[in-house]
Every structure is written in structure tokens, then in C-alpha cells.
């Protein structure tokens, strides 16, 4: 066992501090005059503080001997010069060395107490107004509150960055709130894993059978499964999973579930032969979506008189002749209120959508086009010649901080002006977003839902597009014919082969489709790097920024985590003068390709034409345009939407040189490099391979194991998603809560 070393002294300087995890490197000046380098989790520390550090010596290959902190005690500075160093270090924005010196000279050892409790006394200093005094006091009070909260969290090995979210949600009383019920940390605000909050709560004296623990575990299981695509869980599965999580009896858990239902936190309802348990918001979304869709289906929308003559006019104007199924889809748009249009690549979906748009225009309808992601909306605009926007922006999605939930400007109270709405990439739309869209439609609005039913389902809960098709309650057109021009593309031919359960043709060079066999993961990684850095830019004249690496998985040598690190080094290496920020284990650098990894409804963005909007959403891709000299702010550019991000917001983004196939859904790239190596069984399925192939527009290069690729094509196993939408549509009027 290593000998524990204790050093006591004053923080001389902070060399490095990671805002996300609190990891700090500092210089400690001991009472004996020794300067010691201390490393460890010491959040919110600043020069002038007094530390007592207990730990072990370790030798860093570059920085030499360091004291790795295992335990520490910290107190605020008590000497005037230490108080000056602390105050002038930046702990209180707006107070620099000059102002700090004047404050300390006036108040001496009482400085910190006065700043926090009596900031109005700062007016005693010449040049500090009443307004400035209160501003300084408020900033210092916020700093001290955040510092105490970070220290509290660090005692339970919780990341300091969590303090920011807690303070935003609960204000000055955050510590009291968490002490009263630490299980709140596992809610949607904080997202701490239940096992962590459970350990924390039990150490604080909460009983194993307490109500807070049982209800939190049930909610955690429902939320965890929502994140895996389920709208509800069968009651027996929920009880079994929760009992296993808590190691307790089913009677206690069932009683807690009944209490949650009584308080309307969950809804229990029989769906077919299953007793389904819903989080209330998901139950409301699903039932509302069903009711509103049925109302649209019941309306009299038959405008057949437009169909035959108008479709012929459109063919003549656009210089085309529709295939029978394309004509059927366009004509149906005039006859019924809701239609579904599905088909794979090269089957003419875009041509058909253009025809439907032209039909609606001739009918004099006000048309709105939308898609789930910014990239999909941009592609829809390019293909139709009309403006398309994200569903989120169309509905005016915002975050209501007081209610802690998503809200929409457009609802039944203030519906969309549109008389016809066309939504593309419907396989990406989850039940909550679909419900919100339907709420915003006026009675009589025509709705056209377009997508590829064979692609992966939405990231969010539900299997909406598939449920709608399988219900057979809505007029559906399946485009199956691959047109001659599209057949010339090996990408499209191979995508359809995969969709039929056949292996793609893995001959080396097929024009726009290449396969490079690499059965060793490290060789595959090296090939991916070489393709992106030199071979494709030099030989195919495709710039690196137009190449997207896709992979089924996040983990492993060919996962996004490892590939992003290596691709960043290859494509955007560290150079003198190029600014970067270390955030956890990741480095973010000017010029990096990045992705938004969770919805942020408050981000304000602006385009060059002056258009201003709010909201960045999970899956949005952009780049880092700028990092400020102080490393506190970044300027991000998401396809022309430019937004400032504070360093605390870096937890919302990740590198995007490599993306998972699921994240890439709805996007299309000039060139795709697919790293296809064996991975988790749930990812080695046909839907993942098919979706990956259909992301490439001009060139697809598969690097990987031929056996793994054939296995994926043959494996049609689809992960079951618990959803009641299809059943509700088929049994309208039968469901009862």
C-alpha cells in the first residue's frame, strides 16, 4: 500500500481546470515554502484558497512529480493578500485586480463576508455605484452558491457540471432539495444514473424500502426503456426489472406503482392482452395522436374532379410520365385527407412528392413542407424547390423552464395556417413529435407522410410510420419499382439487395460502390483514416468535409468514440495558433465537425440573411467556427445557423467526423465510408446496413469484414418496440383507461 502524503498550504495558481469533471492541476505553496503540484477533482478552486491535501505521489512523464489528491479540506482565504489573490482570479466576473485591490484595502479580512451578505457597502468605495455594488454582490453570491453545491456533489463523486443544471432548476435551495430527495437527480433535468443516486441516498440514510426509492426506480425503468424506443412497458416486465434493480419484493414495488398511478405520474391500461404502463406524457401523446389522426381520416376530402385532368397537366408541365403507383399517389392526394407514401432509394418518391406539391398548388392550397432534422429539411427544399423547415421550427418548439417541459407555439389554440402539410423522413418521427404536429393542424388539413418503412425507427419512443402502415387504416402507396436510371447506381442496387435479405455485391470496384475487405479491426481503422485523409481527396477529388464516416457502434476500435479521436488528429490536427478546449476526455478545436447530442430549445441562432431562431436539436451537425481567447465561448455554425455556446454547453455536443448509422438517419452525404466490423448483436441487423447504404449519394466505400456484412444482410431481426398506436387505430372506441 502506498504511503499517504499530507501537504497544507495556499493555492498559488491554477494551471488547468476541466469544467465538466472538476479535474484540476494547481500549484500549492506550503507553509514551509515548498511549491507542490496537486492534481485531482477540486472544482471551483481559485488562488488564495487554503488546502489540506492527502494523497500519493505520482510521476507524470512530462510534468514530473505530482501529489494526487485522495482527500482534501479547503477553506476560503483568511489573509488579506490571499483574499486579494482569490478575488482578482476571476471568481467574480467584473472584478479585476484593480477593483479587487480597492475592495480589500477598504474591508480587509471582512471582504468576502461583505461581498456575500452586505454588498451594498461596496458603495463606500469611490467609483462604485449602488447598481454596480449589487451586481458584484450577486455575482459573488452565485459563485459561492455554485462552489458549495460543487463541493457537496463531489463528496458523492458526482460531476461538478451537474451543479450548473441543479442551480438553474432549484436556485439557492438546490442542496436542501437534493438532501430531501436525492432520487430527483435521476429525473430528466439531471439524468444521473439511478445506481449513482441510489448509492448516494442509501449513504445519506434513506431506507431500502422508502417510497422515494421505489417510485424513483419505477420511473427510471420507464424512462430508460423510453430511451430505447418503448412507449410503454408491460406491467410484469416493469415489475420484474424494478425488483431486480432494487433487490426487493414485488409487493412493495407494485404498491409503489399503484401510488404513481393514483398521483397520475403513470397510466396503466390494457392494450390487446397486455397490461401496459405508460409515463403519463407518453400516454397523452399516443392517445392524442390517435384521436386527431382519426378525425382527419373522417373528413370529406374528396376532390376527385381535380385528379385525372390535373395530373395529366402536371405530367405535361414537368415533362414526365408517372408510373402507375406514382400516379395513384398523386391522385389519392386529391381524394383523401391523409396518405402514406413509402419506398426505397430510386423508386421515385421525390418525383411523386413534386407531383403532389404541384397538385396542391393547382387546388389553391397553402402548402407547408417539413422534415424531422435540419439536414432532411434542407434536402427536401433542394429537391422540391420549396422552402422546407424542421418540424420543431414549424411548431415553434421551446423549452418552458417553469414547467420543465417542451412547449409549442402552434397548438389547437393557435394552429398552423397550412391547408396541406407534407412531412418527409417519417420513420424518424417519434410519437411525441407526431402528436404535437397533429395538434397543430386545423380540421380539414391534408396530410401526406413520406418515408422509407425499411429504415431504422426513430431515436425517440415509438414506431410511428410503421404502426401507421401496419394499421391499414390509412391509404398507403408502396413504391417498389426501381427506375432504369437509378438501376445504374450500384449503391441503389445493393441497397435493394440488402432489403431483400441478400448480401450486397462485394466485388471491389462498381463505379459508385467499393468494398475493401479488412477482417482485422486495426487494419480497418487505418484504412478508414487513409481514405478520409488522402485516397478519396487525392484520387476521387472529394474534399474531406464531404466525406462522412458511419459505423454501427460507439464502442470498440471501429466505434465513433475511437474513430472521432483519430479522424480529428488526421483531419484537424493541433497547430500553433489554432484554439482548442479540453472537455473531459475530449478536445474541441476550431474547425472540428461537431454534432448536437441532445435537444436545447434555448439556443439562439442567426443566419447571414438576418433570420433569427431558437433551438438546436439532437443530430444537428455543424462545425466550430471560433473559440474565444479566454476559452469560455465558442461560435458554432450549423449549416448557416450560427450560435454562441458557452463552455458549459460542451456537454451537449460531440465530434462528428464519424457518426453512428442511427444518428445519420435522415441525412445524405456525397460520400460515405462505412466501417463494418462485428459488433453488438442488436446492431448486426439488416436495418442498420440498409440505412447506412442509403445515406450515400455519389460514392459508398465499405471497409470491413465480409462475413459480418453478409450476416447483417441476412439478419432481419427487429428489436420489438412496445407501442399502442397501431392497436388504438384498429380498435378506436375500444380502449379504456
Where are these regions (language model features)?
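Accessory, non-ATPase domains that flank or precede helicase/AAA+ motor cores in DNA-metabolism machines
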Residues: 1-306, 737
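A generic structural signal for residues embedded in beta-strands
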Residues: 14, 53, 596, 624-627, ...
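Loop/turn positions that initiate beta-strands
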Residues: 48-50, 591, 619
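Pre-Walker A segment
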Residues: 270-345, 351, 357
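Conserved helicase motor core of SF1/SF2 NTP-dependent helicases
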Residues: 355, 359, 363-365, 371-383, ...
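Conserved helicase motor core of P-loop NTPases
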Residues: 453-615, 625, 732
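C-terminal accessory regions
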Residues: 500, 618-737
Amino acid at each position: 500500500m502506498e504511503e499517504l502524503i499530507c501537504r497544507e498550504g495556499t493555492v498559488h495558481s491554477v494551471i488547468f481546470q476541466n469544467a465538466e469533471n472538476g479535474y484540476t492541476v494547481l500549484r500549492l505553496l506550503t507553509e514551509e515554502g515548498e511549491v507542490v503540484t496537486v492534481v485531482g477533482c477540486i472544482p471551483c478552486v481559485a488562488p488564495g484558497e487554503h488546502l489540506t491535501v492527502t494523497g500519493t505521489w505520482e510521476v507524470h512523464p512530462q510534468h514530473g512529480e505530482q501529489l494526487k489528491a485522495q482527500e482534501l479540506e479547503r477553506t476560503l482565504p483568511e489573509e488579506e493578500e490571499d483574499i486579494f489573490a482569490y478575488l482578482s482570479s476571476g471568481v467574480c466576473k467584473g472584478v479585476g485586480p484593480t477593483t479587487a485591490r480597492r475592495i480589500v484595502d477598504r474591508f480587509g479580512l471582512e471582504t468576502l463576508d461583505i461581498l456575500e451578505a452586505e454588498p451594498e457597502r461596496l458603495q463606500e468605495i469611490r467609483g462604485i455605484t449602488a447598481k454596480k455594488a449589487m451586481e458584484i454582490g450577486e455575482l459573488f453570491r452565485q459563485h459561492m452558491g455554485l462552489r458549495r453545491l460543487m463541493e457537496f456533489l463531489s463528496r458523492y463523486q458526482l460531476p461538478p457540471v451537474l451543479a450548473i443544471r441543479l442551480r438553474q432548476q432549484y436556485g439557492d435551495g438546490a442542496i436542501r432539495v437534493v438532501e430531501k430527495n436525492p432520487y430527483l437527480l435521476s429525473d430528466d433535468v439531471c439524468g444521473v444514473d439511478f445506481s449513482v443516486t441510489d448509492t448516494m441516498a442509501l449513504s445519506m440514510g434513506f431506507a431500502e424500502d422508502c417510497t422515494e426509492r421505489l417510485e424513483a426506480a419505477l420511473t427510471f425503468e420507464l424512462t430508460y426503456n423510453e430511451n430505447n424506443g418503448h412507449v410503454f412497458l408491460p406491467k410484469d416486465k416493469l415489475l420484474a426489472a424494478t425488483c431486480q434493480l432494487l433487490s426487493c419484493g414485488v409487493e412493495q414495488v407494485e404498491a409503489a406503482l399503484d401510488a404513481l398511478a393514483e398521483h397520475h405520474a403513470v397510466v396503466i391500461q390494457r392494450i390487446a392482452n397486455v397490461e401496459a404502463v405508460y409515463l403519463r406524457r407518453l400516454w397523452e401523446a399516443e392517445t392524442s395522436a390517435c384521436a386527431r389522426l382519426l378525425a382527419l381520416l373522417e373528413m370529406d376530402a374528396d376532390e376527385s374532379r381535380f385528379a385525372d385532368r390535373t395530373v395529366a397537366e402536371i405530367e405535361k408541365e414537368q415533362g414526365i410520365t408517372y408510373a402507375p403507383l406514382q400516379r395513384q399517389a398523386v391522385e389519392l392526394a386529391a381524394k383523401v385527407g391523409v396518405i402514406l407514401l413509402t419506398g426505397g432509394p430510386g423508386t421515385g418518391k421525390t418525383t411523386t412528392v413534386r407531383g403532389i406539391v404541384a397538385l396542391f398548388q393547382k387546388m389553391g392550397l397553402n402548402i407547408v413542407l417539413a422534415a424531422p432534422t435540419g439536414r432532411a429539411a434542407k434536402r427536401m427544399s433542394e429537391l422540391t424547390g420549396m422552402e422546407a423547415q424542421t418540424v420543431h421550427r414549424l411548431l415553434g418548439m421551446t423549452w418552458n423552464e417553469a414547467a420543465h417541459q417542451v412547449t409549442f407555439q402552434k397548438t389547437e389554440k393557435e394552429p398552423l395556417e397550412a391547408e396541406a402539410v407534407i412531412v418527409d423522413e417519417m420513420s424518424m418521427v417519434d410519437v411525441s413529435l407526431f402528436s404535437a404536429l397533429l395538434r397543430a393542424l386545423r380540421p380539414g388539413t391534408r396530410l401526406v407522410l413520406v418515408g422509407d418503412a425499411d429504415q431504422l425507427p426513430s431515436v425517440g419512443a415509438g414506431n410511428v410510420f410503421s404502426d401507421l402502415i401496419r394499421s391499414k387504416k390509412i391509404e398507403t402507396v408502396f413504391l417498389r419499382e426501381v427506375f432504369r436510371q437509378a438501376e445504374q447506381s450500384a449503391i441503389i442496387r445493393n441497397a435493394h439487395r440488402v432489403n431483400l435479405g441478400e448480401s450486397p455485391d462485394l466485388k471491389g470496384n462498381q463505379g459508385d460502390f467499393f468494398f475493401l475487405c479488412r477482417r482485422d479491426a486495426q487494419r480497418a481503422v487505418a484504412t478508414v483514416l487513409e481514405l478520409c485523409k488522402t485516397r478519396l481527396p487525392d484520387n476521387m477529388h472529394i474534399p474531406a468535409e464531404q466525406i462522412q464516416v458511419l459505423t454501427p457502434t460507439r464502442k470498440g476500435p471501429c466505434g465513433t468514440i475511437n474513430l472521432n479521436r483519430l479522424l480529428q488528429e488526421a483531419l484537424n490536427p493541433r497547430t500553433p495558433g489554432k484554439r482548442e478546449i479540453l472537455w473531459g476526455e475530449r478536445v474541441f478545436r476550431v474547425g472540428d465537425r461537431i454534432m448536437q447530442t441532445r435537444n436545447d430549445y434555448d439556443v439562439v441562432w442567426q443566419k447571414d440573411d438576418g433570420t433569427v431562431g431558437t433551438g438546436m436539436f439532437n443530430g444537428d451537425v455543424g462545425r466550430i467556427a471560433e473559440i474565444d481567447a479566454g476559452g469560455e465561448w465558442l461560435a458554432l455554425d450549423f449549416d448557416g445557423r450560427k450560435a454562441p455556446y458557452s463552455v458549459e454547453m460542451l456537454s451537449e455536443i460531440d465530434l462528428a467526423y464519424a457518426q453512428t448509422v442511427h444518428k445519420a438517419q435522415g441525412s445524405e452525404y456525397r460520400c460515405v465510408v462505412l466501417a463494418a466490423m462485428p459488433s453488438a448483436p442488436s446492431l448486426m441487423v439488416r436495418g442498420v446496413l440498409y440505412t447506412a447504404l442509403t445515406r450515400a449519394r455519389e460514392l459508398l466505400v465499405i471497409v470491413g469484414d465480409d462475413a459480418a456484412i453478409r450476416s447483417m444482410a441476412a439478419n432481419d431481426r427487429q428489436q420489438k418496440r412496445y407501442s399502442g398506436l397501431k392497436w388504438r387505430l384498429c380498435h378506436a372506441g375500444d380502449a379504456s383507461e
